[in-house]
Each structure stands twice: as structure tokens, then as C-alpha cells.
Curated annotation (Swiss-Prot):
PANTHER family: ATP SYNTHASE SUBUNIT B (PTHR33445:SF1), ATP SYNTHASE SUBUNIT B', CHLOROPLASTIC (PTHR33445). Coiled coil: none annotated. The chain crosses the membrane at residues 7-29. Keywords: ATP synthesis, Cell inner membrane, Cell membrane, CF(0), Hydrogen ion transport, Ion transport, Membrane, Transmembrane, Transmembrane helix, Transport. This is ATP synthase subunit b 1. F(1)F(0) ATP synthase produces ATP from ADP in the presence of a proton or sodium gradient. F-type ATPases consist of two structural domains, F(1) containing the extramembraneous catalytic core and F(0) containing the membrane proton channel, linked together by a central stalk and a peripheral stalk. During catalysis, ATP synthesis in the catalytic domain of F(1) is coupled via a rotary mechanism of the central stalk subunits to proton translocation. Component of the F(0) channel, it forms part of the peripheral stalk, linking F(1) to F(0). Its main location: membrane. It is a single-pass membrane protein. Pfam families: ATP-synt_B.
Length: 156
């Protein structure tokens, strides 16, 4: 092989080209590649964090739904218990009112019965006195009649 000046010039030119590329072209290219790699790595990490956050949010949402269902069930159970309690209280009050009304009615009935008996006794006594008066054909004065009526009424 023959080494001449052209080959030597080409080697020097190539070396200068490589040095120029290494000094001025290569660092910005490497920096751009590194920035791009960093952005991709950050994007992947962000995607992983987002996936973890999504899983965590879904787990929290599921827990909150379970808690809300449990709370709703408790509220419904308390409402049903309160409803039963109110119904029982209303039944008890109605039963007490019923007993009160029945007792009042019985008392009124007994009072009316006693009034009717007294009235009947007075009428019987008056009839007895009138009959006795007719039998005796004489008039009894009012005081004597009242004494006789009271006496007969007490015996009846």
C-alpha cells in the first residue's frame, strides 16, 4: 500500500471532523437523548404512580361504599326499630284509652242504673202510697207521706 499526501490529508481531515463532532455536535445530541430518556423514565414512573393511585382510589371508593351501605343499613334498622316502638306505644295508648272509655261507660251505665232504680223505687213507693190511700180512703199529709216513702225506699 502506498501512503501518499492525500491519504494523510484525509486522515487529518477525518480526525479534525471527529474532534469537531465530539466537541460541538456530540454533547448536544447526547444531552437531547438523555433528556428524552429522562422524560420517558419520568413518564413511566408517573404512569406507575397513577396506576397505584388508581388502585388505591378504587380501594378507598370500595371501602367508602361498604361503609355507606353499612351506615344506611344501620339507619334503616334504627328507623324500623323506632317505627316498631312508635307503633307499640300507639297500641298501648289506644289500649289504655279503650280501657278508660270502657271504665267511663261502665261507670255511666252503673250511675244510670242506680238512678233508674231510685226512680223506680220512688214510683213504686208513690204507687203503693196511692194504692194504700185509696184503700184507706183517706189522705195522708205530705210529711207523713214523705216519711212513708223514705221508709219504703230504704227497704226496697
Amino acid at each position: 500500500m502506498n501512503i501518499n499526501a492525500t491519504l494523510l490529508g484525509q486522515a487529518i481531515s477525518f480526525a479534525l471532523f471527529v474532534w469537531f463532532c465530539m466537541k460541538y455536535v456530540w454533547p448536544p445530541l447526547m444531552q437531547a437523548i438523555e433528556e428524552r430518556q429522562k422524560k420517558i423514565a419520568d413518564g413511566l414512573q408517573a404512569a406507575e404512580r397513577a396506576a397505584k393511585d388508581l388502585d388505591l382510589a378504587q380501594a378507598n371508593a370500595s371501602d367508602q361504599m361498604k361503609e355507606a351501605k353499612r351506615t344506611a343499613t344501620e339507619i334503616i334498622d334504627q328507623a324500623n326499630k323506632r317505627k316498631s316502638q312508635i307503633i307499640d306505644e300507639a297500641r298501648e295508648e289506644a289500649q289504655a284509652e279503650r280501657q278508660k272509655i270502657l271504665a267511663q261507660a261502665e261507670a255511666e251505665l252503673e250511675a244510670e242504673r242506680n238512678r233508674a232504680r231510685d226512680e223506680l223505687r220512688k214510683q213504686v213507693a208513690t204507687l203503693a202510697v196511692a194504692g194504700a190511700e185509696k184503700i184507706l180512703e183517706r189522705t195522708i199529709d205530705k210529711d207523713a207521706q214523705k216519711d212513708i216513702l223514705d221508709n219504703i225506699t230504704a227497704k226496697l
